């Protein structure tokens, strides 16, 4: 069951979510203007160390960081203390389990080349710049992603 307060937060962030969304603890969710986050039916998101005894290091974090970025979480997905951070797009298929403390990042947060990094420092858009490379991630249906993995 999702609290009324979290429903208000999701609505304010323009996040679409399906039936029976179960939030255990309070996730960090940020949906950049012009981007989208969609959560399917029967999804469970665990965000407190007591909600999964594997030893969660942090709350679940779901972020779109650039315009037109998209995160799509399918039906029946379970997430525990993971970070899902998109500049382009991340799709998680139906009935997939994301283990405790996983990091799913479609970008490296900064360019590898020093010259391009220096350009980014003077870019007025900063972290929103196209200078930060990103590639879409697609995780299929019925997958099991073990704990403490980085994509």
Locations of the language-model features?
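Short glycine/proline- and charge-enriched loop/turn segments
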Residues: 117-128
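Domain-scale signature associated with acetyltransferase and cell-envelope carbohydrate enzymes
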Residues: 1-105, 111-112, 122-123, 132-142, ...
């Amino acid at each position: 069951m999702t609290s009324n307060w979290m429903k208000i937060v999701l609505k304010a962030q323009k996040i679409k979510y399906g039936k029976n969304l179960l939030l255990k603890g309070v996730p960090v969710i940020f949906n950049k203007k012009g981007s989208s986050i969609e959560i399917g039916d029967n999804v469970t998101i665990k965000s407190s160390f007591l909600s999964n005894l594997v030893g969660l290091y942090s709350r679940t974090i779901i972020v779109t960081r650039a315009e037109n970025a998209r995160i799509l979480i399918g039906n029946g997905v379970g997430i525990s203390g993971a970070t899902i951070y998109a500049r382009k797009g991340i799709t998680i298929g139906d009935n997939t389990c994301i283990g405790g403390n996983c990091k799913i990042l479609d970008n490296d947060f900064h360019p590898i080349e020093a010259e391009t990094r220096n350009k980014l420092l003077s870019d007025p858009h900063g972290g929103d710049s196209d200078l930060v490379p990103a590639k879409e991630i697609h995780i299929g249906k019925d997958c099991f992603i073990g704990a403490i993995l980085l994509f």
